[in-house]
Amino acid sequence: RDSYSTAYNLEPDLKESPGTMRDFHTALWILQHCYGLDSLNAIDNANVISEGFEKTTQAYNFIKSLRFATNITTQKNRLNFEAQIEVSKNAKLNNVSSKNSVEIMMKKYYESASTLSYFNEIIFEKYVEKSQSIFSRKVYGIHKNKNKIGIQNVDLKDNKNLIFEIFIEIGKSKEISLINTETKSLIKANIDLIDDNFRQNPLYSEQFLNILRSKNNLSSILKTMKTLGVLQAYIPEFAEVVGQMQFDLFHVYTVDEHTFKVVRNMRQMKLYKQKGFELEHELINKIPKIEILYIAGIFHDLGKGKGGDHSEIGAKTSLNFAKRLGMSSTDANLISWLVKKHLIMSSISQKKDISEPETIKEFIQHVEQNEKLDYLYLLTINDIRATNPALWNGWKHQLLKDLYILSRSKINQQPVMASSETALERKKNVLIKFNDEQRNILKRYFDNLDNSFFNKNDTESLSWQSGLIIKNQNKNIVVGCKAIFENLIKIFIKVENSQGLFYKFTKVLERSGLEVIDANIFSSIDNKVAANTFITKFSHHCLLYTSDAADEVRRV
């Protein structure tokens, strides 16, 4: 079996793939040998699953018929692309195009496979739980036992918050990763509680954002939410792409499965420093709000199958969703922009010569800011890697990385138009990290700088600079150095302004063995303070440490 086998592979094996014949027969065997239920009627009468057995048998009958038709057509169990076209011709779908008939048939398959996969999972978990003790510790109406969590003796109609709260609890713990079968059935039976009023409620909006900020298990949380129908109910646009095929040579997963893999890639990139992705690991842990990246990842392909440009459609729906969550207009617009532009970076890096200045100029006209560039780069990398593992390679990675680095350098060389909204948002994100006394010091400093300073410096950089200022608040000069990316050094200097200061600093850095490759030069509104940032690298094989460079600067 190939390394990316899944229920949502575009060419499934109708006997062995998850959610097909093997899964259903395994569940039947457990029910027969452990519960004495030796027929489908007996299983139905025993109410094994609270939401009814009819949907499960319908799913089984569909996949069984599909397998029979595939066997007749190809003498194999694998429903490959050629077989899909042939089988769909005989599936009473002649009133639509061949492409659409395949998509309709396969969407029905994926829905059926999901139903059988869930049935198999529930039966297996019921068997495991059969010998376990009752749930013990209670947390906010939620009970935990070993690695499972559940809701007991609670009417969800009066406690709707528990629907999301149970996923929040899983995200808090490394030990808890599963929901017990009774609670899964309870949530599925009450899925209609997630209605328009629920979706518009600020409490549940904040809960959803907290789920996205989970420290643990986020990928499995989102998949479980989808399995139980929670994600589709809360994001109706997501329901429309469940089982949606991508009928091309690039995608090997349905839209919903591809979406989960994008978020999983982001998650792994954040948690682990994978070989070759050191830069991306650093970037993803520095972006101000990880939930912005996750939401963009969830929505970037949700416009597919609706007719028209899926990026434009997704941009509108993601903007409305972010506003519904109560996110700021800056954050909502960034999410919408990411969805709208999510293809531009891969397109330019692979189709144009990025060594040409005009190519970089064209690209940064779309991006404009470093913060937007960081988010777009991370979304692009993880989107491509989740499309088809066999098509991702180091060459594509290097093209994207080169485009990112060249664009970042170019953006830093250009004057940035002042944006009061962006400046205000970044100030707020920085000040919230400090206490009242420190905040007052920083406010006085910020008030003496115009908006272009805050557009040029992203939230992470401003936070670092602010920490240096607070640490050295009684000194006339503030100097800080830190390693960034792979072999670069960022140097921040805040000092009393004077004539020729920039020239003096560049000469000092040059004598220290550092080559200046980028610089942000700012003076305060009253022209009394200089706040300069240099991006440098070691010249040749200079072994000077960053602390030595800082000492040299202080001696100027």
Task: Outline where the language-model segments fall.
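Non-catalytic interface/linker regions that flank or bridge core catalytic/transmembrane domains
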Residues: R1-H251
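Amphipathic, well-packed alpha-helical segments that form the structural scaffold of globular domains
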Residues: H25, E121, K226, P236-A239, ...
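Alpha-helical phosphate/pyrophosphate-handling elements in metalloenzyme active cores
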Residues: I30-A42, V252-L293, N320
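Divalent metal-dependent catalytic cores for phosphoryl transfer on phosphate-bearing substrates
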Residues: D44, F53-S65, T254, E282-Q413
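Hard-cation-handling environments
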Residues: A418-F434, N440-F446
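Edge strands and adjacent loops of beta-rich recognition modules
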Residues: Y445-F485
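Segments forming glycine/polar-rich beta-alpha architectures that bind adenosine-containing cofactors
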Residues: L468-D526, I535-F538
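Single conserved hydrophobic/aromatic residue that forms the stacking wall/gate
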Residues: Y545-V556
